[in-house]
A protein has these predicted regions:
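Conserved small-domain helix->loop->beta segment predominantly found in fold-type I
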Residues: 262-271, 276, 280, 286-287, ...
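Conserved PLP-enzyme active-site core in the AAT-like
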Residues: 5, 67-301, 424, 429-431
Length: 449
């Protein structure tokens, strides 16, 4: 006889990890219904897992959106979005000229081999986006805060142009995070994240998310999106709209076709780790944003720095976009143009001690990158010029270290070119807006392009 043992009192405050590749069904009828997508449930971990679902739900709420699909990386999330929107018709994409270099590689090389075409446009000049539209344009792609130059786009105007021309707006919200900006409230139809960065926050797990804000409805122009609105054997002779609903059809296709067939899925352990990171997102991002603004203001006075790329030094229009565009912070990424030769730039990088040289952002550790040699090294000369990056540009992604320690490290590294002419301590009592006003004497890249 087996003795009955009562369940112990108390429940875990952290959700358990469901580390299982497959799921058992009570009956064949249940399995048949789930696999035919006539009932909800899990079929195989490639398309769903309880931990992954929890992460998707959390990010959907943060973005104030409709639904989300988690992927193995941010690149995978972008790829699924573009395949689901432009792949079936060899569509055309209008993309920001100030994108992360890996996204440029994806657009101009790998996806170009599938028939996708792209035209780049300045995110600060909506007229360039209007001029780039063709009859095949299906997607506008841009970043809410650009990586690496941290400029803000004319998002609402650009989104209006896209929607007038039947295009879907995808916004990469990795740098801003939903804590600082929610693109769906400003015209975005889809939002993508490299969850590796700020959502995770500790430089460990690799993951991505594709989020549908609920603004895109393919039934408003069904002939433009037939792979979403017409029946197909893949969906049991139904359309994705019939299976998932108009506002979830796109991500239904992204998950059950492209994620299922290509396999860039997120593991249960990764989803669990990213969810733990999200629990401290607000605290981390607010500190990183404040520290980045302080460092940018300090470096704007340094004789070894020719220019600072940060929204508070981007000129009047950038300030207006920040104040009126729905931003709740400027993020933890900024860049500088070093006032020196290529050899001196390299010496500055190699002289940093606390700040590490690495190709990542959003870590609790402050990192530096040389975009021309690293993240943007495969750009063509034309793309490189349009990006605003130079061989003297250094990108910083600010962590959680003390601002005084970071300032000291930057000053000792920059001293190979010139010593600071004043102590940053004189500015510490000023709020960030006052520091920005005091430092506005240097020319901005945005004032001359």
């Amino acid at each position: 006889m087996t003795e009955h043992v009562n369940a112990p009192l108390g429940t875990p405050i952290v959700a358990p990890i469901h580390h299982s590749a497959a799921y058992a069904f009570a009956s064949l009828a249940d399995a048949r219904a789930v696999f035919a997508q006539r009932a909800s449930g899990y079929t195989y971990a490639r398309t769903g897992n309880p931990n992954v679902t929890a992460l998707e739900s959390a990010v959907t709420k943060l973005e104030r959106a409709e639904c989300a699909v988690a992927t193995s990386s941010g690149q995978a999330a972008v790829t699924l979005a573009l395949l689901a929107l432009a792949g079936p018709v060899n569509g055309h994409v209008v993309a920001s000229s100030h994108l992360y270099g890996g996204t440029v590689d994806l657009l101009t090389d790998t996806l170009a081999e599938t028939g996708l075409t792209v035209t780049f446009a300045d995110p600060r000049r909506p007229e360039e986006w209007e001029a780039a539209v063709t009859s095949q344009t299906r997607v506008f792609f841009l970043e809410s805060i650009a990586n690496p130059l941290a400029d803000l786009p004319e998002l609402e105007t650009i989104a209006d142009i896209a929607h007038r021309n039947g295009a879907v707006v995808i916004v990469d919200n990795t740098v801003a995070t939903p804590h600082l900006f929610t693109p769906g409230e400003h015209g975005a139809d889809l939002v993508v994240h490299s969850a590796t960065k700020y959502l995770s926050g500790h430089g460990g797990p690799l993951g991505g998310l594709l989020v549908d804000t609920g603004n895109f409805d393919p039934t408003e122009d069904p002939q433009r999106w037939p792979w979403l609105t017409t029946s197909h054997p893949r969906w049991g002779d139904r359309s994705p709209v019939e299976v998932y609903g108009a506002k979830r059809a796109l991500l239904g296709v992204a998950r059950c076709k492209y994620l299922n067939d290509l396999g860039p899925c997120m593991s249960a352990i990764t989803a669990h780790e990213i969810l733990q990171g999200i629990s401290t997102l607000g605290v981390r991002v607010e500190r990183q944003s404040a520290t980045a603004a302080s460092l940018a203001a300090t470096l704007n006075r340094h004789p070894a720095v020719a220019r600072v790329h940060h929204p508070q030094f981007g000129g009047a229009r950038q300030e207006e976009l920040y104040e009126q565009g729905g931003y709740r912070g400027t993020g933890g990424v900024f860049s500088i143009d070093v006032n020196g030769t290529p050899e001196q730039v390299e010496h500055v990088v190699d002289s940093l001690r606390l700040i590490k040289l690495a190709a990542n952002i959003g870590d609790v550790r402050t990192l530096v990158a040389h975009p021309a040699s690293m993240t943007h090294c495969r750009l063509t000369p034309e793309q490189f010029r349009a990006s605003g990056i130079t061989g003297q540009t250094l990108r910083f992604t600010v962590g959680l270290e003390d601002v005084a320690d970071l300032t000291a490290d930057l000053f000792q590294a920059l001293s190979v070119i010139a010593d600071a002419t004043e102590s940053p301590a004189a500015w510490e009592h000023l709020p960030h807006t006052a520091r920005a006003t005091a430092h506005q004497q240097k020319d901005s890249f945005h004032d001359h392009h």
